[in-house]
Amino acid sequence: MLVLALSLGASAVSSLISFVGSLTKPGGLKDQAATLNGSYAPGRPWLDLAWQMFGIATALVPVALVAHLLIREGAGLRTIGFDRTRPWSDLGRGTLVAAGIGSAGLAFYLVARASGFNLTVVPESLPEVWWKFPVLILSAAENSVVEEVIVVAYLLRRLDQLGWSPMASLVASSVLRGSYHLYQGIGGFIGNMVMGVVFVLLYRRWGRVGPLVVAHTLLDIGAFVGYALLAGKVDWLPTP
């Protein structure tokens, strides 16, 4: 599908190549680092900010393509529950999902890394500038919108139209989610695949992607901002 080729399908291939590189590199996986939000222009904060905003904006283009394709078939983003018709319900459900997944996900990562199945994930390595936290929050929101709209809502819709069974669609969506996180290691693949299963089941139940976007945004904000505040200050949080 064109949408996947332009977005997370390509990311999955890139992630696989990156994982092979990490796996064949001397030393263990946990001695290597995977940085999620890094500087594009070290020592040049305004240029760095411009690159950060450019990256966030262009990453959302496939979502605009999804909206266009849905409108062409007489639907729209409201069809997948990505609208403002039920904001408080979406916020409440998303917050509960994030609370349930967050602590379990962190514990799984720590165990996977300690066991040598995961790289050391560095959620952010941005300079200490005024725009650091706003950019991290925007990055979290961008990741969430792209992943949930494309890998859950749009992919499931297309697979349903192609006659795939609900189980086959669930497997396809969750394996794809795990695949584009494979650059983090085997733990990243398994953990995100499990999260994908949960998110697909919730989407099928609620018929709305809004709560999933909220949950994913809160999870990523917790990871990005939490790491920025705690890295090097607590013993249990791995750093390179």
Where are the regions that the model predicts?
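Interfacial transmembrane-helix boundary/kink motif in multi-pass membrane proteins
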Residues: M1-L8, Y40-W51, A75-L106, E128, ...
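Transmembrane helix-loop-helix hairpins at the membrane interface
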Residues: A10-A12, G102-L106, L110-P240
